[in-house]
Amino acid sequence: FSDQQIAQLLEISPNIVFVDSSPDERRFDSVVLNFRLGVEQALDYLLYKGHRKIGFLGPAYKLDQKKRPALEARRQYFIDYMKNAGLYDEHLIIDTGLSAKDGSAQIRKWLEQKDHIPTALLAYNEESAITAVSNLREVGLRIPEDVSVISFNDTPLSILTELPLTSLT
């Protein structure tokens, strides 16, 4: 929301609750996804399934409400969890940037380093997961036999893929 839009909303009511993010967390309440819990649940599940070489797919930064670079929380929660588990490997973090085109190029570049292929990937959204699945299959890897993929944002996009995605909401 722009400052002008927020001012217009405040003219209607001083009681504003934002959904999915907040333009100013000190002034406004918000309802947001618990990304930390989602990352923990996904990684707990993958570890339970026997995976130890788990990668993360997503941007290092995203744009905040005012279009400023902000750390991507899911990525940081992933790094923290994997470090605490003694399984963190910086080579398994793929910085995809913010577009599918950038992501696809980064995934292809990363796949050329054959010794850094994980047995599982946690993608920060479905677009990244779909891009990863496509690129993994292009180099002959099977999903989920060779690489399991879990994504965030369980949207209708996940059912439009040839292989159904495992997604967190």
Name the predicted role of every residue range:
Residues 3-169:
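Bacterial carbohydrate/catabolite-sensing allosteric modules
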